[in-house]
Structures are given as structure tokens and as C-alpha cells.
Amino acid sequence: MAKASTFTMTSEEQALNDHHLFAQVLREALPYIDFLKEKTLVIKLGGSTLEHQQGILQDILWLQALGAHPVLVHGGGLYINEWLEKLHVPTHFENGLRVTDATTLDVVRMVLLGQVNAGLVLLASQLGGKAIGLSGIDGRMIRARVADESLGLVGEIEAVDPTLVQTLIEQGYIPVVAPLGQSADGSCLNINADLVAAHLAGALHAEKLIFLSNVAGICRTDGSLISELNETEAQQLIEEGVISGGMIPKVSACFDALFAVPNVHILDGREPHVLLRELFTDQGAGTMITRKKPPAA
């Protein structure tokens, strides 16, 4: 029986193949790179993806180097839970929101500002970037009121002043924002980070709002990923129960942003280079939600 033939590329052929692949990738990416120049991108980093922060920050620095203006909003729920347990502070949630008394708020502030925010800024600097950490209290950026007395010091956003963030962007910095706000009487309030990202993206008239979480995006009942849908279609999926559980408040935050932001993306932040694949390839890597289509003429 004849032996099956094998084919092995020479080093020159492999190099030529690599060059062709590089050229193909570059041709595909160039229109997207050109489109995103000088555009603001608000990126929300969920607490469940913080262990992948180095890769995410590297991609964010690439976005800035390519001419985009990234703004990072972060959560920190897992770290907050860890410290509350260490300090023997009881905690519980209602409708997905942490009930926050004064003691809990002290821990929330300590973790968000002293650990997560400061850690992201330090890592960005170590990677060669320039980031500045702040929260919604700085410059009275996020004005809020108590959302529900039963939730304690949990804020509902009333207004966002993007001036401080815009100033940092103009100076070449990457703003890193912790989800805290301030009430009319000066009290600090704990605010859901998805909502902070959505309202800040709207105030900045960002080109895109991107949620990095621990899911690939919105999936059909058979588990297949939906790469794109508009807000009307997303609302229908909520009503049908296809979008359920913790994805509902995230998609609701998307709806909050779509009045001022053309596109909102939900990506799995644990996947390598998911930001670059979503923004610079035709195939994408997650789910994009767009504004509902206008009625036909």
C-alpha cells in the first residue's frame, strides 16, 4: 500500500503564509481603526473579569494607541464580598442590589478605591499607559439620590457631569471610574457599576458602550450566540424569557445608554483579546445591541 504523502512548509513558505495572514487581518481591521479614531469608548469591567485585567488593559492601551478614547468603569463585587466576610460584616441583596448600611459602605469604598481602582491604575502604568483613578464623587461627576430606603445607601443616578472625564481624555489619560456617587446632602452612595457605565456613556455621547462580563453575550435557547439585535428585539427576548436572570439588568442598562450611544456590546472579558476581536473584525466576538430601527417610510 502506498504511503500517504506529507507536506511540510519550508521556513520561507511559512513566512510568506504569515505575511499573507497579517495583510488579510490588517485589511479587515483598517476601516474599523479609521472609524474609531477620536471616538469615545466606555468599557465596563465586571468584577468577575478582574482576574484577567492585565490582558484587558493591554487591549485598552492598544485602543488608545490606535486613536480611540477609552474610559474604564469597574465593579468589584467579588472583592467586596471577600472583604465583608473577612471583616465579619453580614451582607445580602435585594433584586440584585447590595443592601448597604454605613459599615458596608465603608468596606465598599475601601475595596473599590483602595484595591480595585488603585490596582487598575498601577497596572496600566506598569504596562506603559497613563491612567487616572477617580469615582463619581470626584468633581461631583455623579449626582444621585437614595434609590429605596430599604436598600440603605444605594444610589439612583439623577445626573452625570462628564467635564472631568472629558478633561482627562483631552490630556491623554485613561479615566478609571469607581461606581460611587454623591447625594444632594453630600452623602456617598453605592451605585450599580452597569448603570454608572451606561449613564456616563450617554453623558459623553460615546460611540460605544462595552460590557465585559463572564458570559459570551446574549444566547438563543439552543445556546447559540446572537451577534446583533436591536433594542426592540432584545425587549422581546426578555418577555419570552430567553434573556433572564442577571442578564436582564445588564440589558436594561444597555437600554438606558442607547438614547445617546449608537451601539452597546456584551462580551466575555475572560476571552483573550475579546475587545480587539469585537471591534476590529467582521465576525466580532459577542453581542451588539443597536437602537431600534425607525418605522418604514
Residue ranges and their predicted role:
Residues 285-287:
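Charged catalytic cores and adjacent phosphate/nucleic-acid-binding surfaces used
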Residues 1-270, 283, 292-297:
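Nucleotide/pyrophosphate-binding catalytic subdomain
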Residues 276-281:
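C-terminal/domain-terminus segments
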